[in-house]
Amino acid sequence: MGVGQSTELPGHVGTPEHLSHVLAERFATKCFTPLELTHFKDNFFSRAIDQGGLKYWNEKILSDFLGIPDSSDSHCPLDAGPVIFRMVSYLGAFPFQNTLAPSVLTFEAMVKVAVLLTERYGRVLRRGRKDRIKLLFGSLADVGRRNVSTSPDTEDVCRETDDTVKPHVTGFEVDAPANDDYGDEDEDEDDDDLALAALESLDAIDVFKHDSRVDKKVYEARISVATLRRLLMLFLVIAPLKTLEPVTLYTSDLNEARMESIRKEADTILAAFSTEDSDGGISYRSFANITSTALPYLFDPLTPLFEHLLFSKNLDMTKKSRSDATVTDTIEKPSDSPGPSPSTIVLPGGFESSILKPSVVSHLSFFLPSPTSNANLLRGNMRLHPVFSTAVHGSSLTSFSHNVLTWNAGTLLLLEGAVSESSEHGEGMVTLGAYLPQPWKSAPLSHSSTKPSDSSALPCLFELSPKHQLLQGNPSPSVQKPNAPVAYFSTSTGIAIGCQIPPPSRSQLLTPTPLGAGSLTVDTSLESATFYMSSIGHNGVFLPPATTSMSEETVRKQIDIYTMEIWGLVPDPSDTSSSDLSRQSPVELQRAKWEFEAREAERRRNLNLKAGAGDPAAEGARWLLETAGLIGDRPGQRGGSL
């Protein structure tokens, strides 16, 4: 790993160290621009420790550069530095983790780390995200270094190579201006695939496959709960981090109350990972299942964190000289002046949330997509506009209808309460929610005709606490039925999400019934809710949660509601590039509807309904009100759905 340039010495080509170096060169040319490599080299070499010509980073340098709190800090509520260093040391040995990990953090190792953690692996990993999950598990699991037997010939070759090559890292030849050998865009991509496939076959990139080649010791490895908890707490703090934002913007105000909220949220996420059959640790099967289905954006904070490597404050690109850039002799010291306050996804409005704490928003970003893109909620330039809250607007369906049914955009429903004593699960606080990317409809028993083409357009039902559970939307067209809307509202039965709506009846009041794997119903007083979840059922709006095993029974929780909030999903008002300025925003449309309702209410007050039978004015007025659906008792006239 300390070889600075590619060599073609006889017998040296097949060694893991040399192949790892060649792969690092390929990573650099395929995944970074020349300008990014220039910044990367400056960041690395200006801070690297030089020991006998070998330049590398240690844990302290890595933590200080990234701004991650570690045990060296006097006040250290987040001790995530050792966890990140452990991950980086493992990933730096890719694709020979079993033989070379933990690796010394040379420039070559850091190049591979940056590619893998900034999600630039599309051109070097054939299975992309699936391979990344395996690598992330290995970087966190307690896997020992494998003893590799080498033949005497190989030992002699390595000894000769060590005598002829100086152990120093000077960067890659391809970083020089003349990098035509590796930078040709017309290079045969098939050769790359074959080369990378050969590299994969030499080590454990497919170590978790269920076949005879599986390394049992690695497969049976576990991630300790303490290790994952420290990493989750870091992610909950830096989840809103944007590219090139200083991490201290989010780690400088970690008071006791904030840390308590972060610990609580981390424990609810940890509860999703099954540890019963893993000797107290988290198995690969559980890790892969949860991170790919229930927490698909969990590791997204690593991308902006490690993108700091690709921008150096020491490079003054405004000054031109013979070289392309000018590098200062000293490292720029961070300013002591307070920086800007971190941005928030919650827009100011009619109320302040009692549920959407910063740690809860971070938790939501680990699995909720942006309605306009496949990025997570915090990365998709979306904001949450306050629409309805029982704490402010009261527990009234009339108020709910006035505020929610007039909102012409997607919504996020959040509910917090206590599980009633009558419930089979006893007492305890619970936080539930529903992500509804389509607007509510006021037409009775109507169903959106939109056929979602991606996951961001699908609804989902979730439990945030005491255990993270996600019921994803069912993409099957067969579940799109008029009597099975995603969300339904009625002044007679209340709110129903993921239920089957019964036909209207004059003789009795029929309530919505659960359909499929999950549902949520709220009564007409907005004071009680019922949460239903099953490990089976693919005929409804929601699919079974990944965290539920087939042996678990159906869960039904009766909840006494403390607070229920509805948040509207709107584009970032400050982002004018993605919005159509000629189009009215959902806030403006809602305000226009309210003004129209106010005018109609004033008009109705002026109608004379006290005239005698057969009065044309009275009949016309009554016809107008019936047409608007404000009076009359025709079946199915009251209610609305999504």
From Swiss-Prot:
PROSITE patterns: TLDC (PS51886). InterPro entries: TLDc_dom (IPR006571). Residues 322-343 are annotated as: Disordered. It is found in: Cytoplasm. Keywords: Cytoplasm. Residues 354-570 form the TLDc domain. Pfam families: TLD. GO terms for cellular component: cytoplasm; nucleus. It comes from the Eukaryota. GO terms for biological process: response to oxidative stress. Its main location: cytoplasm. Belongs to the RTC5 family. May be involved in a process influencing telomere capping. This is Restriction of telomere capping protein 5. It comes from Aspergillus fumigatus (strain ATCC MYA-4609 / CBS 101355 / FGSC A1100 / Af293) (Neosartorya fumigata). The lineage of its organism: Eukaryota, Fungi, Dikarya, Ascomycota, Pezizomycotina.
